[in-house]
Regions:
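Bacterial N-terminal signal peptides
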Residues: 4-16
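Lipid interaction determinants
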Residues: 16-159
Length: 159
């Protein structure tokens, strides 16, 4: 029995530095390199936004994540429909984040969509040098009512 306790203790000690290393490697600014959205019901994957997508995600030493993605030929609005389209062609939120193995969880305290405030947003990630590869958990889509989707995003480190 004591061998199992020692083995588990050693595994915990090995994992803690790895999480600390990931946190140190996440800190900084990342620029959007690409993204896709996948629909659960059909398996269809399509570009996150068709054109002109831009975005950044920032992780601070203090444990805050801030992210914004825009896309699809955004222009200054002239009508209410234009204003609604601007809301549909962006995502922006921020909050304190924590690492849990291969995912980070953001406790959202400000967001472009008030429904996200007070929620935990879960993102699975993999660091590949200066690339951050991310996918979300399955969730209801804000842009495709009645659809369950997940998003795949690749970021590159800003130097």
């Amino acid at each position: 029995m004591s061998h199992w306790v020692v083995a588990i203790f050693c595994m915990i000690l090995a994992v803690r530095p790895a999480l600390a290393d990931d946190r140190a490697n996440l800190i900084g600014t990342w620029k959007l390199a690409g993204g896709e959205i996948e629909f659960q019901d059909t398996g269809e994957r399509r570009p996150l936004y068709a054109t002109d997508r831009v975005g950044y995600i920032i992780f601070t030493r203090e444990g805050r994540m801030m992210g914004i993605i825009e896309g699809d030929e955004r222009k200054a609005p002239q009508t209410d429909e234009d204003r609604a389209r601007l809301l549909r062609t962006m995502v922006a939120y921020s909050g304190l984040y924590r690492l849990e193995g291969d995912k980070w969880v953001t406790a959202v305290d400000v967001a472009w969509n008030p429904a996200w405030i007070g929620t935990d947003q879960v993102r699975f990630y993999k660091l590949e040098g200066d690339r951050l590869v991310v996918n979300s958990a399955w969730a209801p889509s804000t842009n495709f009512p009645g659809k369950i989707v997940r998003v795949y995003i690749t970021w590159t480190r800003v130097k």
